[in-house]
Swiss-Prot record:
Disulfide bonds join C251-C264, C263-C316, C293-C351, C297-C353. This is Left-right determination factor 2. It is linked to Left-right axis malformations: The defect includes left pulmonary isomerism, with cardiac anomalies characterized by complete atrioventricular canal defect and hypoplastic left ventricle, and interrupted inferior vena cava. Keywords: Cytokine, Developmental protein, Disease variant, Disulfide bond, Glycoprotein, Growth factor, Heterotaxy, Secreted, Signal. It comes from the Eukaryota. It is found in: Secreted.
Amino acid sequence: MWPLWLCWALWVLPLAGPGAALTEEQLLGSLLRQLQLSEVPVLDRADMEKLVIPAHVRAQYVVLLRRSHGDRSRGKRFSQSFREVAGRFLASEASTHLLVFGMEQRLPPNSELVQAVLRLFQEPVPKAALHRHGRLSPRSAQARVTVEWLRVRDDGSNRTSLIDSRLVSVHESGWKAFDVTEAVNFWQQLSRPRQPLLLQVSVQREHLGPLASGAHKLVRFASQGAPAGLGEPQLELHTLDLRDYGAQGDCDPEAPMTEGTRCCRQEMYIDLQGMKWAKNWVLEPPGFLAYECVGTCQQPPEALAFNWPFLGPRQCIASETASLPMIVSIKEGGRTRPQVVSLPNMRVQKCSCASDGALVPRRLQP
């Protein structure tokens, strides 16, 4: 079964490519969708000359303008290097385990997480226990193992987030791997000092009903009982050093662009006053800096690409964007009035090197 996060829809910018320049057609299309229009409205010049933008409309526009400079939509970047963190069972019940990992200083500075893998050792089931359950069909001999990130809020309440889920067979034993990249991404968003990383692992029956098997109770994750620490839960952290594999920030306006230019953010001005369709329709702003992502990204070593074959070549993309507030004129019932709208993901705030297929993390909710 593929990890859950591979099935999630990736966040897509309204750009032709990951870091491509915003076009006039894309800007117009976004504005029409926001206003739920099929075509550009026809507005009389005489009506526009009489139109006055009320103070409350302009105030709303200013508020959105300020907010757009603070709120950003985030994409996700890529990384390399390997680090292993040993964890421990904080609490265990028949079908639920609470794991704790001390994470402070485990992620190198100026690095980015590619993948975090939780490894748990599944103990072999004694033959006598299997015999008591009778002959199990392949379906009834499976259990669903679910991993959730557990966050303890400041008020003492708990919040869980689903991270990964997969089927395991009661007939198998050994190390099982779960993708917990998103849990570490959530943990990184916590304010300092951060609490340890808490992962809740639950084992449940896959099929419900009167004929469902109770074989899921046979699945246990614990120490092998071999040398000390051999069966402890392990958290593998794979990162890349952004000094080598990241973007460089804003482009140097003095330096010419070449094939070897490192990924950077380049200024690009969108002149709304020069667009025919915007005349008499878009009142504010007259234009804006949209920026675009240009340049190339260093590719990871072949060994890393082999470990994650689902990741494509790394590209220079817009990893953080901001909305664009506008004041437009709307005609309703023979009257023309101004209206404030906000177009999402119109201005590039940050460029990064990312691999096609890489995880796009969710924002941590309060």
